[in-house]
Amino acid sequence: MIPLQHGLLLAAILFVLGLTGLVIRRNLLFMLICLEIMINAAALAFVVAGSYWGQPDGQVMYILAITLAAAEASIGLALLLQLYRRRQTLNIDTVSEMRG
């Protein structure tokens, strides 16, 4: 069994990597991927904590997080596809410009 500190440290590292990618990247597709990494890091923390205390609640929350991530990914990819068809780019700087 993996110790609690190791699992939570791995989850924290994954979360920080996802957050860093979300802040640094300018492509919306990569930002969506980084958001998925952050959701998976939080789900990993739930599983590790549930395993440490011997409760199945962490695994239930993991299933809920995976369901949420799948819904978020499908809606996000559909929106990105429509955005790419209209603007021919996924760069956040060009997308955020408002028409006046």
Curated annotation (Swiss-Prot):
Compartment(s) of residence: Cell inner membrane
Keywords annotated in UniProt: Cell inner membrane, Cell membrane, Membrane, NAD, Quinone, Translocase, Transmembrane, Transmembrane helix, Transport, Ubiquinone
One family name in Pfam for this protein: Oxidored_q2
GO annotations of cellular component type: NADH dehydrogenase complex; plasma membrane
Residue stretches spanning the membrane: 4-24, 28-48, 60-80
Membrane topology: Multi-pass membrane protein
Main subcellular location: membrane
Catalyzed reactions: a quinone + NADH + 5 H(+)(in) = a quinol + NAD(+) + 4 H(+)(out)
GO molecular function, one term: NADH:ubiquinone reductase (non-electrogenic) activity
Enzyme Commission identifier(s): 7.1.1.-
Single GO BP term: ATP synthesis coupled electron transport
Coiled coil: none
Keyword Endoplasmic reticulum: no
Assembly and oligomerization: NDH-1 is composed of 13 different subunits. Subunits NuoA, H, J, K, L, M, N constitute the membrane sector of the complex.
Similarity comment text for this entry: Belongs to the complex I subunit 4L family.
Biological function: NDH-1 shuttles electrons from NADH, via FMN and iron-sulfur (Fe-S) centers, to quinones in the respiratory chain. The immediate electron acceptor for the enzyme in this species is believed to be ubiquinone. Couples the redox reaction to proton translocation (for every two electrons transferred, four hydrogen ions are translocated across the cytoplasmic membrane), and thus conserves the redox energy in a proton gradient.
Protein name, per record: NADH-quinone oxidoreductase subunit K
Organism: Dickeya chrysanthemi (strain Ech1591) (Dickeya zeae (strain Ech1591))
